[in-house]
Amino acid sequence: MLEKLIERVLFATRWLLAPLCIAMSLVLVVLGYVFMKELWHMLSHLDTISETDLVLSALGLVDLLFMAGLVLMVLLASYESFVSKLDKVDASEITWLKHTDFNALKLKVSLSIVAISAIFLLKRYMSLEDVLSSIPKDTPLSHNPIFWQVVIHLVFVCSALLTAVTNNIAFSQKERH
């Protein structure tokens, strides 16, 4: 009897995630606001914007879109996995969610982080002259911010690859048993 009570209480604690999911949806609102603000800024300066600034603005919008997609994916998958099934929604609208288990979500998050990091590096590459001109010529590599940004990006790439390999090994072993 005590065991059943403990199990029910523990299982009911999943609903503590629901307010967090709702709060996380506010992050989407903020990202949407920033996206629209950046888009408006780009459109309002269309006559005077340089090609480089246009590309940088577009990359910024893509970055915000990736981030919003990442937030939405984690939000929906977390709710579906840990709180409650999304049974009120047309199943054809969220078919990807039915195939997203925790391991697939980890991989998608890892790949999204790599994509966001790559966009950040591409934006830095587009303004490379400005960045390099602000660094003294005799600065050691360990003090160069671009060096560390590339290193961090490579860590993200390696992490995503290791996640994919680990998932692949785990799923292939699961299929054998």
Swiss-Prot record:
Keyword Transmembrane listed: yes
Keywords: Cell membrane, Membrane, Transmembrane, Transmembrane helix
Main location: membrane
GO cellular component term, pick one: plasma membrane
TM ranges: 15-35, 54-74, 145-165
Subcellular location: Cell membrane
Superkingdom of the source species: Bacteria
Pfam families associated with the record: UPF0114
Membrane topology: Multi-pass membrane protein
InterPro entries the UniProt entry points to: UPF0114, UPF0114_bac
Annotated family: Belongs to the UPF0114 family.
Alphabetical list of PANTHER family matching this protein: UPF0114 PROTEIN YQHA (PTHR38596:SF1)
NCBIfam families membership: HI0507
Protein name, per record: UPF0114 protein jhp_0175
Organism: Helicobacter pylori (strain J99 / ATCC 700824)
